[in-house]
Structures are given as structure tokens and as C-alpha cells.
């Protein structure tokens, strides 16, 4: 049986830090002495982008706001399965998606990457999408969780949201897996 505690204890502090940063935008660092491989990631809200070394083409699915508007969990799971298959074909370990932020502001320039303004719908769709991707032994990495409503100064902006709104609206979709 694999002993994660033993492995963590064998890692040096520098090795632990290196696992938190990454080799580049698409690969994690590897630790050869402990047989820890690099993990390959890929982005794309509606397709498996791959990396610049891949010459394989990508399928382009409708953007998440379009598939979210179907309210069809079975269809969205099939999209997830297809994305998982394509990711596997490109040797991708982790698909960076889905994006689960809610549409909270009409000027949100990346809302097309999100499923909906409705937290319950977003949560249920995200669960189906993730189950589809992960059925192909590819990890799905949820991103843009809460209060990511603007592209203006996106790396430094402060999204100030009161606790009541966070609990009543912004966090609701994060509990969708509890109500299968």
C-alpha cells in the first residue's frame, strides 16, 4: 500500500516547494529520486488545448454558457467524457476546468467560460462535467470559484462580498456534490 506520509517525510523542503510551483505553465516539477513524475495539465473552457509541443488538433465544444443553458446533465456528462478521452489521447493528466464562477456582473468579459448565473444549476452541471472527465482517469480541476467577476486588473483586484451573499449565493454551487 502507498504511504503518503512516508513520501512527504522523504521530500526536502525545496522539493515540497517545487511541487507547489510547477516547471512551466503546463507541467508540474518532477522529483526523480522519489519517482514522482511531472503532471501534465491542459487548459481550455471548451476543448483540450494541449501544449505547444502537441501537433494533435483539438475538438471545439460549445462554450460552457451554451451547454449550461441546456440544463441537460446527461449531455454535459457526455461532453466531459469526450474531453476526458481527448485529454487522455494527449497524455494530459489534469484538465483545468470546469470554470464554476457565477455570472454576477453584466460586464464580466469571461462569462462565456462559466455555466450560469444560477448557483444550483452551475453546481449540478459542474458535477456532471467532472464525472465525465474523471471517468477517463483524467483529473478535473475546478477553477474560478467565487467572486471572479472582472478582467480589469484581475491579478490585483479586491472582490469585496459580504458574508451573507457568499453563503446564500456564491458558495451554493460548491455544495452541489452533496445533493446528488
Role assignments for model-derived ranges:
Residues 1-175:
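Glycoside hydrolase catalytic-domain context in secreted enzymes
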Residues 176-180:
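A short, hydrophobic C-terminal helix/tail in secreted or cell-surface proteins
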Amino acid at each position: 500500500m502507498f504511504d503518503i506520509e512516508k513520501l512527504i517525510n522523504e521530500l526536502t523542503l525545496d522539493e515540497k516547494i517545487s511541487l507547489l510551483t510547477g516547471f512551466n505553465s503546463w507541467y508540474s516539477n518532477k522529483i526523480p529520486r522519489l519517482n514522482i513524475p511531472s503532471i501534465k495539465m491542459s487548459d481550455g473552457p471548451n476543448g483540450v488545448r494541449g501544449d505547444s509541443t502537441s501537433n494533435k488538433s483539438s475538438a471545439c465544444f460549445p462554450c460552457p454558457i451554451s451547454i449550461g443553458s441546456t440544463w441537460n446533465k446527461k449531455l454535459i456528462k457526455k461532453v466531459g467524457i469526450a474531453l476526458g478521452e481527448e485529454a487522455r489521447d494527449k497524455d494530459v493528466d489534469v484538465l483545468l476546468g470546469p470554470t464554476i464562477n457565477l455570472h454576477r456582473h453584466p460586464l464580466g468579459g469571461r462569462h462565456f467560460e462559466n455555466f450560469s448565473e444560477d448557483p444550483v444549476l452551475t453546481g449540478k452541471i459542474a458535477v456532471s462535467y467532472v464525472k465525465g472527465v474523471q471517468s477517463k482517469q483524467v483529473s478535473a480541476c475546478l477553477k474560478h470559484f467565487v467572486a471572479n467577476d472582472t478582467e480589469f486588473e484581475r491579478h490585483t483586484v479586491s472582490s469585496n462580498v459580504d458574508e451573507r451573499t457568499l453563503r446564500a449565493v456564491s458558495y451554493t454551487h460548491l455544495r452541489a456534490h452533496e445533493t446528488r
